[in-house]
């Protein structure tokens, strides 16, 4: 690793963009190199974004630039931003440059560090085996099974439950699989990160997780790079420790948004809807590194904010192309009080294939989707004429669809204190058994309320008995 330092000075400051001038052309840093300002009242990291002429490096600040003056000395490290990796990062919380922000002891200087800018694994190194990743969440395991080492997107507008679903997945992975997780909080609320940290301590899963945050209030440079910081930590567990690791990114839209801000600050001509012209390339450079290799896997779950609930917006639609499974959260389902508010018809997974999940799982999932699709088509008739005008067959379809819709709801462990319902982890075998019995008509006599917020089908049967007793 090159540790030769060179020195320049601040030439111009325009918000988070800092121009640094170097006297010697040989001292000029490379693109992505890290520059450091270390003054008594300010410690700031910069990343080189452009080289102007023979002597100026235009940089993006990774922290606030208030109080920065011209002619301040700048040290060029002649290497990209590097962050700590390995088991020492577990149970800790970091910022974009790998500094601990949890007020615990500093990271030891002997801990290995890796550059956040790394090439994606070569095609020869990648693994193409398909394996189901059990989450314990019924609607996901049945209709949109996740792939081990795959990329999963959680699409939804504001307030439909993306972050809660991510937190539940972290809980279930840590308790059910004992797996390692890396959580990258990209441009989201500080309060949510704080809550997540203390919930993980309470749930006993913090020792299996590394947390990296670049919140909403931070400059665009930090929000643009924090996903790479988290990914670098995950890559070390995969490539060096040969482990399977989960990478949670909340929210990938903020990564795009920060890139758009930086692009505008650098004076690039905007593209569609005001986004940066390099949108697809930036997204690809992140997503191509998230993959399974022959040594281990990174399974990534990415919450994706959808601006104005418009899935055709360039930010979510660019992300679509990289995903194995799309989990769409729907405001209409949330308004019915059904959580997780996953839309079972809009959500898709390339793993829902009989050769991967098996014939019984595939047929049950398809029957569930057919019943729900028929129910959707009948909604207008019911709204205009009433349910009594339907044929007996259609009435039965509506009854089963409502039971399925209710049975797709599930109490979450991380929402126990809000809902008062004890969280449930449902194995795939129980999920398939429950839904296959509903579509076969074995529970046509049970009231639909019995299926609301239960785990397995046996709980629904018990709930029905209780409802009958209470009249």
Curated annotation (Swiss-Prot):
What SMART domains does its record include?
AAA
Subcellular location(s): the record lists: Cell membrane
- Keyword hit for Nucleotide-binding: yes
Task: Give the matching PROSITE patterns.
Answer: ATPASE_ALPHA_BETA (PS00152)
Catalytic reaction annotation = ATP + H2O + 4 H(+)(in) = ADP + phosphate + 5 H(+)(out)
Give one Pfam family: ATP-synt_ab_N
One Gene Ontology MF term: proton-transporting ATP synthase activity, rotational mechanism
Q: What class of enzyme is it?
A: translocase
Domain of life the protein comes from: Bacteria
| Positions with a binding annotation for ATP | 156-163
Q: Please tell me one Gene Ontology term that the record gives under cellular component.
A: proton-transporting ATP synthase complex
For membrane topology, the record states:
Peripheral membrane protein
This protein's UniProt keywords: ATP synthesis, ATP-binding, Cell membrane, CF(1), Hydrogen ion transport, Ion transport, Membrane, Nucleotide-binding, Translocase, Transport
Its primary localisation, in coarse terms, equals: membrane
How does this polypeptide assemble, per the annotation? F-type ATPases have 2 components, CF(1) - the catalytic core - and CF(0) - the membrane proton channel. CF(1) has five subunits: alpha(3), beta(3), gamma(1), delta(1), epsilon(1). CF(0) has three main subunits: a(1), b(2) and c(9-12). The alpha and beta chains form an alternating ring which encloses part of the gamma chain. CF(1) is attached to CF(0) by a central stalk formed by the gamma and epsilon chains, while a peripheral stalk is formed by the delta and b chains.
Its annotated function is as follows:
Produces ATP from ADP in the presence of a proton gradient across the membrane. The catalytic sites are hosted primarily by the beta subunits.
**Name assigned to this protein:** ATP synthase subunit beta
Q: What is the lineage of its organism?
A: Bacteria, Bacillati, Mycoplasmatota, Mycoplasmoidales, Mycoplasmoidaceae
């Amino acid at each position: 690793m090159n540790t030769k330092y060179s020195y320049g000075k601040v030439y111009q400051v325009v918000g988070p963009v800092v121009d640094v001038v170097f006297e010697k052309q040989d001292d000029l840093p490379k693109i992505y190199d890290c520059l450091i300002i270390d003054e008594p009242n300010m410690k700031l990291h910069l990343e080189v974004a452009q080289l102007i002429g023979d002597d100026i490096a235009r940089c993006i600040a990774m922290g606030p630039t208030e109080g920065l003056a011209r002619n301040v000395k700048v040290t060029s490290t002649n290497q990209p931003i590097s962050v700590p990796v390995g088991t020492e990062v577990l149970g800790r919380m970091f910022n974009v440059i790998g500094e601990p922000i949890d007020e615990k002891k500093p990271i030891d200087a002997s801990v290995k560090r890796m550059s956040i800018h790394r090439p994606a694994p070569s095609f020869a190194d990648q693994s193409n085996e398909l394996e189901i990743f059990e989450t314990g969440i019924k609607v996901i395991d049945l209709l949109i099974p996740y792939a081990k080492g795959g990329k999963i997107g959680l699409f939804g507008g504001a307030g439909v439950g993306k972050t809660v679903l991510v937190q539940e997945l972290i809980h279930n992975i840590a308790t059910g699989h004992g797996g390692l997780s890396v959580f990258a909080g990209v441009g989201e609320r500080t309060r949510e990160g704080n809550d997540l940290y203390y919930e993980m301590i309470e749930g006993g899963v913090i020792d299996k997780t590394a947390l990296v945050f670049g919140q909403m209030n931070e400059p665009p440079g930090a929000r643009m790079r924090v996903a790479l910081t988290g990914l670098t930590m995950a890559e070390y567990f995969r490539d060096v420790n040969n482990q399977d690791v989960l990478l949670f990114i909340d929210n990938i839209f903020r990564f795009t948004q920060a890139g758009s801000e930086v692009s505008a600050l650098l004076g690039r001509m905007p593209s569609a809807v005001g986004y940066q012209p390099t949108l697809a390339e930036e997204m690809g450079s992140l997503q191509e590194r998230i993959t399974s290799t022959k040594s281990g896997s990174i399974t990534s779950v990415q919450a994706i904010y959808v601006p104005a609930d418009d899935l055709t917006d360039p930010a979510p639609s660019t992300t679509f192309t990289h995903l194995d499974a799309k989990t769409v959260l729907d405001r209409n389902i949330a308004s019915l009080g059904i959580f997780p508010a996953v839309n079972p018809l809009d959500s898709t997974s390339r793993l829902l294939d009989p050769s991967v999940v098996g014939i019984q799982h595939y047929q049950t999932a398809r029957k569930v989707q057919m019943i729900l699709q028929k129910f959707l088509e009948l909604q207008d008739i019911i709204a205009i004429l009433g349910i009594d005008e339907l044929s007996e067959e259609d009435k039965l379809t509506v009854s089963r669809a409502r039971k399925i819709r209710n049975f797709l709801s599930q109490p979450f462990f991380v929402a126990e204190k809000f809902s008062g319902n004890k969280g449930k982890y449902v194995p795939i075998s129980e999920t398939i058994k429950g839904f296959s019995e509903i579509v076969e008509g074995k529970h046509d006599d049970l009231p639909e309320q019995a299926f609301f917020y239960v785990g397995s089908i046996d709980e629904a049967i018990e709930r029905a008995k209780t409802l009958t007793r209470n009249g």
